[in-house]
């Protein structure tokens, strides 16, 4: 079971193309200026089974998936189960937003397991003083777009570069 604040279909701001965005409830960071402070409390969400969420993600053949929040890494086991099911039953790519850094996630076995199924990670806490509205898919310039699968293979952080012209 996962505590979910909202599920948005056909969003275009949480990664490239059309996406089904799953907004997790619960976040330990409490970043000043957060665009979604109601997501901090895990009890603000609705408890949903991974199967229930999976059906919503699979219902749109053309949309990929995004885990956001809140922080999906606050509920790593449930999101790992969901991501594994998405990958087994579709060819969708999965983006994940988190306030943790990639390096910190690798040190936590529960969170590192989820990375096995994530294609692109947007990492780092939102920092209001580094806010930049010109960035694609990030709120502040300290946040990184990371190609997770390439990073895991290379055993070093590999940036993901988004080219809006493609």
Residue ranges and their predicted role:
Residues 13, 103, 130, 154:
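Flexible, glycine-rich phosphate/dinucleotide-binding loops
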Residues 119:
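Receiver (REC) domain switch/active-site residues of two-component response regulators
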Residues 61-68, 93-94, 122-128, 152-166:
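Conserved C-terminal portion of the radical SAM core fold
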Residues 75-84, 90, 131-166:
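P-loop/Walker A phosphate-binding loop and immediately adjacent motor/lid segment at beta-alpha junctions
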Residues 1-23, 32, 36-42, 157-158, ...:
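N-terminal [4Fe-4S]-dependent radical SAM core
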Residues 8, 125, 149:
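Residues at the C-termini of beta-strands that transition into short coil/loop
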Residues 2-5, 18, 36-114:
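Conserved Radical SAM active-site core
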């Amino acid at each position: 079971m996962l505590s979910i604040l909202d599920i948005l279909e056909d969003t275009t701001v949480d990664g490239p193309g059309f996406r089904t965005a799953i907004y997790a409830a619960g976040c330990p960071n409490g970043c000043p200026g957060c665009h979604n402070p109601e997501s901090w409390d895990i009890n603000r969400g609705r408890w949903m089974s991974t199967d229930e969420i999976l059906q919503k993600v699979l219902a749109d053949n053309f949309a990929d998936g995004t885990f956001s929040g809140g922080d999906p890494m606050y509920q790593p086991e449930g999101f790992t189960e969901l991501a594994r099911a998405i990958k087994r039953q579709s060819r969708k790519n999965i983006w994940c937003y988190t306030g943790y850094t990639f390096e910190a996630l690798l040190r936590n076995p529960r969170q590192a397991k989820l990375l096995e199924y994530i294609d692109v990670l947007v990492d780092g806490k939102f920092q209001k003083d580094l806010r930049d509205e010109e960035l694609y898919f990030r709120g502040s310039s300290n946040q990184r777009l990371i190609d997770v699968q390439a990073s895991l293979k290379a055993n070093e952080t590999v940036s993901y570069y988004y080219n809006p012209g493609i």
